[in-house]
């Protein structure tokens, strides 16, 4: 939240052009292209559009290359929580509750795991199910490796118990989550999707800049026939799925309009439950069994609340070239609007500040990860638990004692608001235990 408030947005101009190109029937169709770079100032954008008024546009180069997309690994606890939030709108706690019911009824394997490995039984079952439903060309058995920091891999990845069972009986939530798990698991054992990506470079006769038009066509759908991975709403996905009309090198193009739109850099996105789980996993904080309880606890104690940000109005500039005339327009947009994000409360801010001041070592992101590593050493018999506890309390206990001794000088959870204008005495607010 502090990074967001401290963020300074920077403006630039994104230039897009719509060209009219004949299709296979000779009918003119629209083709979108984007300038290869962002322009830093309005004056620079204005100057480019002035050049375009009298310019000739020519296809300078066409490149076509094959592209392969591979499926994601089967679900771990973390990735299941993230994908269920994005695709189904489930909270982290809701996902674990439904997964628990599926596990207890024998529908899926254990749902608290950081492993992406599948047993040979599951791989063979997937292979058979894919071949029966879609044919042998869709089969591609795979073994995945876990890349998460501190992963223990005590269990298999989350998968259906019987791969041939595509649907189950149960509640609507159970059916949805099972369907998600089944598709993800099946897709992980399917062939790559094969695509062809085409990029056309368009030159401007009186300027050094170029426009790029890109298109993508699926040659073989592979795993995409079953499953497409979702992304957080704050991750911008390029729209390259459109097809390009027939083009040839040296072809002259006619523009319909060219637009320079003022755009702004965005502040770091606030966390959703799903993106917070991903961050916890990246930092090595906690285990699959603790992600959901951690996120629930900080909300129950009102350190964090889930809510929406309405956003603010912002003016932005649009310069348009159409029919050889340049128009300059100022428009309004809403920026910063966010839905279902985790927002820190005043209580959470005060508690965090207090802990950062008096217990910085425990608040360090590496603390939990290092403790988890020490637990692993205890489990493997390399270290005695008493040694680790003594080392920890040797520094922790004095910190607690010194903090208690100082609490009369600075009350726990206390924030100074200022001086009373009548009495001149300091006014403060104190927050209770939680």
Please place each PLM-identified region on the residue numbering.
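Basic, low-complexity terminal or inter-domain segments flanking catalytic cores
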Residues: 3-6, 12, 45, 63, ...
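Eukaryotic nuclear/nucleolar intrinsically disordered, charge-dense low-complexity regions
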Residues: 105-108
């Amino acid at each position: 939240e502090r990074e967001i408030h401290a963020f300074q947005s920077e403006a630039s101009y994104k230039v897009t052009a719509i060209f009219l190109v004949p299709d296979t029937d000779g009918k003119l169709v629209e083709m979108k292209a984007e300038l290869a770079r962002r322009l830093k100032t309005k004056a620079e954008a204005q100057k480019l559009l002035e050049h375009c008024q009298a310019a000739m546009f020519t296809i300078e180069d066409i490149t076509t290359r094959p592209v392969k997309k591979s499926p994601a690994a089967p679900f771990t606890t973390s990735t299941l929580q993230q994908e269920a939030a994005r695709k189904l709108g489930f909270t982290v706690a809701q996902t674990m509750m439904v997964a628990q019911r599926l596990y207890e009824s024998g529908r899926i394997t254990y749902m608290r795991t950081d492993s992406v490995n599948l047993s040979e039984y599951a791989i063979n079952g997937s292979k058979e199910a894919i071949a029966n439903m879609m044919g042998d060309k869709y089969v591609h058995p795979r073994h995945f490796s876990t890349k998460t920091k501190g992963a223990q891999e005590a269990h298999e990845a989350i998968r259906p118990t019987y791969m041939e069972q595509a649907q189950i009986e149960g509640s609507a939530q159970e059916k949805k989550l099972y369907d998600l798990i089944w598709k993800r698991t099946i897709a992980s054992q399917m062939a790559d999707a094969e695509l062809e990506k085409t990029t056309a470079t368009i030159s401007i006769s009186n300027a050094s800049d170029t426009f790029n038009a890109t298109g993508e066509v699926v040659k073989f759908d592979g795993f995409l026939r079953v499953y497409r991975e979702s992304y957080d709403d704050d991750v911008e996905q390029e729209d390259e799925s459109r097809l390009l009309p027939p083009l040839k090198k040296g072809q002259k193009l006619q523009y319909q309009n060219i637009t320079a739109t003022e755009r702004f850099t965005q502040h770091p996105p606030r966390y959703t439950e799903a993106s917070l789980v991903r961050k916890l996993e990246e930092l090595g904080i906690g285990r699959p069994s603790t992600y959901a309880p951690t996120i629930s606890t900080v909300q129950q104690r009102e350190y964090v609340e889930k809510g929406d940000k309405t956003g603010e109005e912002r003016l932005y500039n649009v310069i348009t070239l159409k029919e050889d005339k340049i128009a300059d327009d100022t428009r309004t947009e809403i920026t910063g609007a966010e839905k279902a994000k985790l927002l820190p409360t005043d209580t959470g801010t005060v508690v965090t500040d207090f802990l950062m001041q008096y217990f910085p070592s425990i608040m360090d992101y590496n603390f939990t990860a290092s403790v988890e590593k020490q637990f692993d050493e205890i489990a493997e018999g390399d270290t005695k638990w008493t040694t680790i506890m003594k080392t920890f309390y040797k520094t922790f206990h004095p910190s607690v004692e010194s903090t208690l001794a100082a609490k009369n000088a600075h009350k726990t959870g206390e924030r100074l608001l200022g001086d009373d204008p009548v009495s001149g005495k300091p006014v403060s607010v104190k927050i209770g235990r939680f």
